[in-house]
């Protein structure tokens, strides 16, 4: 079989899943044994969603996590377990953050935000490392932390496009909610107390507009989205990962806009083959939100 029966994309030799839609391919074609030809054992560089694998790293055959384009070594089971573990970690993270915040006096809210962001980053890093990339060659590439497919200028423009689309959808959603005068589904009003005052606001920006975008994009796009593609295909994986991303924000008022943002970020990751444009778009939105709370 030379083409995917689901979407018609030409298959790659030995690929277990279609590089475009993630459909499972039957009767994979075996590659000739390189060992039998007296050649060093090589494996293709594991690819991000929709990015063809490249044979630029030499691994032992037992170490190579995947040679199929768009395939990662973890699957839906690890994704579900990872989501559960991160959710459970919210309990100790919240307890520690509030305990530390109680010692900060008038800056308790800002301290709680800063501490919780960094503790969640550690939690996510541990979960992703253990369930996804532990003992895997080039783990950063498996998570999309690789160079972008397009030139820098085009990648930045795509990120800005995703940011603009997210902001526009959020404005439209807020207008619709206000039209129906629904307090339940209105975005929550977050006070300026979440930020440190004066020059110390740098630490709030560092937490919310740098650490949060990196860790969330690695988890929701690099780990969850990529891990769901082989089982559900790209479109369903985008929807499911966006739903998880939205649910993690624990507020009915942002459920819809965050879901739409999650779709845009998954599409951006799919388009660029790298997490970094997603981080840029995510960071821009968070930085704008913090700046409005501090300076507006």
Could you say what each language-model-derived stretch is?
Residues 93, 125, 129, 133-136, ...:
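Alpha-helical transmembrane segments of polytopic integral membrane proteins
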Residues 89-93, 120-125, 162-173, 285, ...:
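Alpha-helical transmembrane segments of multipass membrane proteins
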Residues 69-82, 150-160:
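Alpha-helical transmembrane segments and their helix-start/interface "positive-inside/aromatic belt" motifs
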Residues 1-40:
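Cys/His-rich metal-coordination motifs, chiefly Zn-binding "fingers/knuckles"
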Residues 16, 23, 37-80:
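N-terminal juxtamembrane cytosolic/stromal segments of multi-pass membrane proteins
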Residues 105-114, 139-212, 230:
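Juxtamembrane helix-loop-helix connectors linking adjacent transmembrane helices
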Residues 82-137:
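Alpha-helical transmembrane segments in multi-pass membrane proteins
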Residues 164-167, 190-296:
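Transmembrane helix-loop-helix hairpins at the membrane interface
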């Amino acid at each position: 079989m030379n083409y995917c029966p689901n979407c018609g994309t030409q298959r790659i030799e030995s690929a277990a899943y279609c590089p475009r839609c993630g459909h499972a391919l039957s009767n994979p074609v075996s590659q000739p044994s390189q060992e039998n030809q007296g050649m060093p054992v090589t494996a293709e560089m594991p690819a991000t969603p929709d990015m063809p694998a490249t044979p630029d790293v030499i691994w032992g055959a037992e170490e190579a996590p995947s040679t199929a384009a768009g395939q990662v070594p973890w699957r839906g089971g690890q994704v579900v377990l990872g989501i559960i573990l991160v959710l459970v970690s919210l309990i100790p993270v919240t307890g520690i953050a509030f305990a530390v915040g109680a010692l900060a006096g008038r800056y308790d809210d800002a301290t709680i935000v800063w501490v919780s962001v960094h503790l969640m980053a550690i939690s996510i890093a541990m979960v992703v490392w253990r369930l996804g990339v532990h003992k895997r060659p080039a783990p950063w590439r498996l998570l999309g932390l690789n160079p972008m497919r397009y030139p820098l200028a085009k990648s930045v423009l795509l990120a800005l496009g995703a940011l603009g689309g997210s902001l526009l959808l959020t404005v439209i959603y807020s207008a619709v909610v206000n039209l129906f005068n629904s307090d339940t589904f209105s975005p929550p009003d977050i006070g300026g107390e979440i930020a440190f005052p004066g020059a110390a606001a740098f630490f709030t920006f560092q937490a919310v507009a740098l650490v949060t975008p990196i860790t969330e994009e690695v988890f929701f796009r690099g780990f969850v989205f990529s891990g769901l593609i082989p089982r559900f295909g790209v479109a369903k994986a985008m929807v499911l990962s966006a739903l998880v991303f939205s649910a993690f924000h624990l507020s009915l008022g942002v459920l819809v806009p965050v879901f739409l943002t999650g779709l845009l970020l998954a599409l951006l990751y799919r388009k660029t083959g790298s997490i970094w444009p997603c981080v840029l778009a995510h960071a821009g939105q968070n930085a704008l939100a913090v700046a409005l709370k501090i300076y507006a």
